[in-house]
Regions:
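Glycine-rich FAD pyrophosphate-binding loop
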Residues: 10, 14, 26-45
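FAD/FMN-dependent oxidoreductases across multiple families
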Residues: 116, 206-280, 286
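Beta1/beta-strand and adjacent pyrophosphate-binding region of the FAD-binding site
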Residues: 2-17
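Active-site substrate-recognition segment that forms the wall
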Residues: 178-207
């Protein structure tokens, strides 16, 4: 019989949320086990857009491509807009390695890759090969198909991002709004340092994946971006938020449904929630301040999406109004805050 192990905190998932949670818990008196089912930390289908949270999470300049000016295409016209908060484009493999390096010297944190979570109970979790781990706190940071979320009986509302990985760096960050092709979804071109992500984000409940792929091809053909030999990949994004704390079990990032259904943005929510959960575990009086702020912007963005979904005849006009409003720093602050 396998010996039962014990950790104060078990974190399932070594993405941005789980790694940030482990980093904040590093150096404390708490014993921490961070597991991930993948052998390598970092790789994930993701466009890579990240608005760096002010004051508590930074990345070296050499890791990102940074864009303060964005280009929006609507109705055959290109609009150029400066944004008050630049968007940083980061490769998820690089981000994972960087975050992992931040916890390597934390003697109270053990990282195990190639380790899957199975049955989950209120005080223990079963891993592959029958290992039983007892815990005081369990943190679900295991993405949109979260095992931890499923153990809590919570459903999902999944959106989808589909992208080509083009092996050359484009020079502009571009957003496509085309209601005839994408409904209330959008397309993007996100240039990384050595490659480009070009994709679409959509709701599969009202917009079939096949149509989304066709729309993406048409958008990129019209823009003149060569993609025929590029790798195509896709991933679900859970946007149904039901809470973070469930007694001694916590959800973070996409496992918590924190990503915005309007933009698909998830990394800033992941980092903030991993940080908040760790702080709450250390000090139970801490009330998840960063996530409460971010949820305010998620709610605003998803209300705008709701209006677009309910008024399909007026989407082109609504997109035009939206672009016009984005020219105003006050609206940018209202829409996405200071994160």
């Amino acid at each position: 019989m396998n010996k039962t192990e014990f950790y104060d905190v078990v974190i399932v998932g070594a993405g941005p949320a789980g790694l940030r949670c482990a980093e904040v818990l590093g150096g404390t008196d708490l014993s921490v086990l961070l597991i991930d089912r993948k052998v390598s930390v970092g790789p994930k289908t993701c466009a890579g857009g990240l608005r760096l949270p002010d004051g508590y999470f930074t990345l070296p300049d050499h890791m990102t491509s940074t864009f303060g000016r964005h280009y929006f295409l609507l109705g055959g016209k290109e609009y150029s807009l400066p944004l008050r908060k630049p968007l940083h484009i980061v490769d998820r493999t690089d981000l994972g390695r960087y975050q992992l390096d931040l916890i390597r010297d934390s003697k109270n944190v053990i990282v195990e890759t190639g380790t899957s979570a199975g049955h989950i109970a209120a005080d223990h979790i079963l891993l592959n090969e029958g290992r039983k781990i007892r815990y005081r706190y369990l943190v679900g940071a295991d993405g949109s198909n979260s095992v931890v979320r499923r153990s809590l009986g919570l459903g999902n509302r999944l959106y989808v991002g589909t992208q080509y990985i083009i092996p050359e760096a484009h020079d502009k960050l571009v957003w496509f709004f085309n209601p005839e092709l994408l409904g209330s979804g959008y397309g993007w071109i996100f240039p990384h340092r050595t490659f480009t992500s070009a994709g679409v984000f959509f709701n599969p409940a009202i917009f079939p994946a096949r149509k989304a792929r066709e729309a993406l091809d048409k958008l990129l053909q019209g823009y003149g971006l060569h993609f025929r030999d590029a790798k195509l990949e896709g991933a679900p994004v859970n946007c149904l938020y039901k809470g973070i704390k469930f007694n001694n079990i916590f959800l973070t990032g996409d496992a918590a449904g924190l990503a915005s259904a309007c933009t698909g943005e998830g990394m800033v929510y992941a980092v903030a929630s991993g940080d908040d959960v760790a702080r709450h575990i250390i000090d139970n009086s801490y009330r998840f301040d960063r996530i409460r702020r971010l949820l305010k912007y998620k709610k605003r963005q998803e209300f705008i999406l709701y209006v677009f979904d309910k008024l399909p005849r007026y989407r082109t006009s609504l997109f035009r109004i939206f672009i016009s409003l984005l020219r105003r720093p006050a609206f940018q602050r209202y829409y996405s805050g200071d994160f």
